[in-house]
């Protein structure tokens, strides 16, 4: 029983180390070039990348209240910016 448990734990540890090493090699094989846009930032929809502060950015027009900018549709407010969840 103890030998089986030790064998399973050893295999799990080897698998974790192998996966970590494979991820590091993959990251090293794809170096970022200077001026190359970050893939996460390039994928962000420009219309969604706006400040989501508590105060209104749009001034009141007549009797209408201004609308607060909110993040929606799988986006959340983090550090006053809308980011994909």
Curated annotation (Swiss-Prot):
State the similarity comment. Answer: Belongs to the neurotoxin 12 (Hwtx-2) family. 02 (Hwtx-2) subfamily.
List the propeptide residues: 23-48
> What is the protein's quaternary organization?
Monomer.
Q: Does the keyword Secreted apply?
A: yes
Localization annotation: Secreted
Q: Check the UniProt entry and state the signal peptide residues, or none.
A: 1-22
Q: What does this protein do?
A: Neurotoxin active on both insects and mammals.
Name under which the protein is recorded: U4-theraphotoxin-Hhn1a
